[in-house]
């Protein structure tokens, strides 16, 4: 294939992108300086560990510009090969997180830890492990301090003593990864290809089951079954080194269930902190917040530490709320439990919500799990319990496209309207939802359609300092009074 010469349009876009980067860099440096001078805990928007609005906008703009530069200057064929093999980046990170490499490095000298020492503790042959770590160093995760020594950098350090974040890496790289491997076949199959049934996905093919993912996660099985699914899924890597002991009934819980619950806390901390500060929770006083399908209560856990007047009810399947009540909250916020500020209720969100007239009904990462018909049922079950003053907050990704959406802000031209590279995780999660549960990350128009079908009306999309937004919905007759 002959090399194609660049056009005047390409040159113009390159200059425009360079100017955006130059201007944005100045904003980032100014915001970094302001952060360094500010007293600890006095962020510009009262949000520890959260960037100012100006810094957040600058971050996503410069990441979008980096993506545009990559598009403009890369050799097309080389770029195709690069993207085709990027799954190895994810696998290398999974190996490092699963073997707790960041924690091993944190316990060593600042100058780095020798690969032989890392290898001995991680139980991976040193030359192979060194190649994996060099790969990660090349994409800015970890740093190499000598020919055979490695240390954490600011990126890998995020995993040190961070079980929830580690769990998220495990979540998407265990059965989630195996499901993605089966996705091409599933899309072409005459039965599963056009289906949005939660039990007809690539994930069922991967783990060799007819159960839904939630039913499978809650199974109790013989220990040896954890490594012998009968399908394409090999199980959690560490199980190769030893299976858990049988419990009194001769069975064990799947480790993926606990990983799932903990990962929701980890993901919430990354993308959910903004929702604690970018919505006016303080104005609600002692309002009752019902977290529908709330898992172990990860988001109320965040809110409870910032707004001590708020009250919470966490609703989900029995084994999940049990994990929140008995393991997560006693460790993370026992005071809220003792004060009765949080309750855990077993509930299926397809049934009419048992809590009537709550101030806020909160749906985080629920609707993206389900296709449209299921979502309308979930929303209608909440609507029937809402009072005139009630509000529904949907915490989900609101997908923009590279050509933009009239309901969402766009990046400056010539950058992709949806901020391109900045949204890579959002689109990746959309395909993960497709692979595992036939779920969907939706556009504003798609959310409006769901709400209308359920007898609700979209009031506002809260643009938060996150890739995940808050969609506020109300009963139609109250929309004019809010």
Curated annotation (Swiss-Prot):
Does the keyword field hold Nucleotide-binding? no
Q: What happens when the gene is disrupted?
A: Resulted in loss of trypacidin production.
Which PROSITE patterns did the record assign? SAM_OMT_II
Disulfide-bonded cysteines = none
The superkingdom of the source organism is Eukaryota
**Which residues of this protein are catalytic?**
368 (proton acceptor)
Q: What's the Enzyme Commission number for this chain?
A: 2.1.1.-
Q: Name one GO biological process term.
A: secondary metabolite biosynthetic process
UniProt binding sites for S-adenosyl-L-methionine? 293-294, 316, 348-349, 364
The free-text tissue note of the record is: Specifically expressed in conidia.
Q: In which pathway does it act?
A: Secondary metabolite biosynthesis
Classification via InterPro entries? COMT-like, O_MeTrfase_dom, Plant_O-MeTrfase_dimerisation, SAM-dependent_MTases_sf, WH-like_DNA-bd_sf, WH_DNA-bd_sf
Q: Which family does the record claim for this protein?
A: Belongs to the class I-like SAM-binding methyltransferase superfamily. Cation-independent O-methyltransferase family.
Query: What is the name listed in the Swiss-Prot or TrEMBL entry for this protein?
Result: O-methyltransferase tpcA
Give the organism the record lists: Aspergillus fumigatus (strain ATCC MYA-4609 / CBS 101355 / FGSC A1100 / Af293) (Neosartorya fumigata)
Q: Which gene encodes it?
A: tpcA
């Amino acid at each position: 294939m002959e090399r194609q010469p660049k056009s005047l349009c390409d040159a113009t876009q390159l200059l425009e992108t360079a100017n955006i980067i130059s201007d944005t860099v100045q904003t980032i440096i100014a915001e970094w300086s302001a952060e360094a001078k500010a007293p600890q805990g006095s962020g510009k928007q009262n949000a520890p560990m959260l960037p100012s609005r100006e810094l957040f906008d600058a971050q996503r703009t410069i990441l979008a510009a980096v993506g545009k530069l990559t598009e403009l200057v890369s050799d097309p064929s080389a770029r195709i090969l690069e993207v085709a093999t990027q799954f190895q980046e994810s696998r290398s990170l999974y190996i490092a997180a699963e073997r707790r490499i960041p924690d091993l490095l944190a316990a060593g000298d600042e100058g780095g830890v020798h690969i032989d020492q890392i290898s001995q503790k991680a139980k991976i042959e040193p030359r192979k492990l060194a190649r994996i770590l060099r790969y990660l160093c090349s994409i800015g995760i970890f740093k190499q301090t000598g020919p055979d020594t490695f240390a954490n950098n600011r990126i890998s350090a995020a995993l040190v003593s961070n079980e929830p974040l580690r769990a998220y890496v495990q979540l998407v790289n265990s059965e989630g990864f195996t499901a993605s491997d089966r996705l091409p076949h599933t899309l072409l199959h005459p039965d599963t290809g056009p289906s949005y049934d939660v039990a007809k996905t690539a994930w069922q093919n991967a783990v060799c089951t007819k159960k839904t993912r939630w039913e499978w996660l809650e199974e109790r099985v013989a220990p040896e079954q954890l490594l012998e699914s009968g399908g394409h899924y090999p199980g959690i890597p560490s199980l190769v080194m030893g299976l858990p002991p049988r419990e009194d009934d001769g069975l064990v819980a799947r480790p993926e269930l606990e990983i799932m619950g903990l990962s929701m806390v980890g993901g919430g901390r990354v993308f959910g902190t903004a929702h604690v500060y970018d919505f006016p929770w303080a104005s609600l006083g002692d309002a009752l917040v019902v977290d529908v399908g709330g898992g172990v209560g990860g988001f109320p856990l965040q809110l409870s530490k910032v707004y001590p007047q708020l009250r919470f009810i966490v609703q989900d399947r029995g084994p999940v709320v049990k994990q929140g009540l008995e393991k997560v909250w006693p460790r993370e916020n026992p005071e809220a439990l003792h004060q009765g500020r949080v309750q855990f209720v077993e509930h299926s969100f397809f049934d009419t919500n048992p809590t009537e007239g709550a101030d806020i009904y909160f749906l985080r990462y629920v609707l993206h799990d389900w296709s449209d018909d299921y979502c309308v049922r979930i929303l209608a079950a909440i609507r029937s319990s809402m009072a005139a003053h009630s509000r529904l907050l949907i915490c989900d990704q609101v997908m923009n496209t590279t050509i933009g959406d009239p309901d969402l802000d766009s990046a400056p031209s010539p950058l992709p309207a949806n901020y391109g590279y900045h949204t890579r995780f959002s689109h990746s999660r959309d395909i993960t939802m497709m692979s595992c549960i036939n779920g969907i990350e939706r556009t504003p128009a798609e959310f409006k359609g769901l709400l209308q079908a359920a007898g609700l009306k979209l009031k506002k999309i809260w643009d938060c300092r996150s890739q995940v937004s808050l969609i506020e919905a109300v009963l139609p007759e109250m929309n004019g009074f809010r």
